Amino acid sequence: MRAGIKSILLILACAVLFGAGFRPRPLPAAAYAATGYSFAGALRAWKESLGPPLPEAVLLDVPVVYQWPEMPNGCEATALTMLLQYYGFAADKLSVAYDYIPRSDFTYTWFSTYGPDPASAYAGDPALFGFYCLAPAVAEGANRYLAEQDSTLRAVDISGADGYVLRRSIAQGRPVVVWATIGFEPLVYSDYSWRLYSDSSVYHPYKNLHCLIR
């Protein structure tokens, strides 16, 4: 395992992070007084409070794991497996998908299809007919795995984190798991839908969501 690293970062546009404390510090009130309340001076003081500037580019040696052919719909498990392997764990993508990340099959009735909220569990079967899961479910799966390995690392969902938070994590040697779209195209809703087990509300999934590691 990589020495000196206490947390793993998983992230999405929904986002997940192994560790916390990545928010930039707010600008101290004294900084405004010292600069005469000028915007340029306050901005300069705020940037200085963030620490050293981030590099333009960072290349991390993340292991490559292919989701195909076993899991055509298993990008979340594949991305998490790559992240765990980066930290020195002998993670297997099929085990991560079926033993650790929460998963729930669909139930079919005469009138409706019922399924999980992707925030809480993977919807369907990643090897067959499945959709996706979101950051909370992936973080839960990661923490199940880490606990079983007696690791001090923990995954934290940081959905909504801004670009600076993600870039700083990568610059510190911590890759992130993010949700994007296939080809980075605009989000598209699927024609398929189901009712949630939790409250019977109708859920319309995205058609082109994709999970990857950055």
Identify the role of each PLM range:
Residues 74-76, 154-156, 175-180:
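Structural recognition of the beta-strand scaffold that forms the well-ordered cores
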Residues 80, 147, 183:
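Residue-level marker of positions within ordered structural domains that often coincide
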Residues 125-164, 168-172:
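Mid-length scaffold segments of soluble, non-membrane domains
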Residues 160-213:
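Active-site-adjacent substructure of cysteine-protease-like catalytic cores
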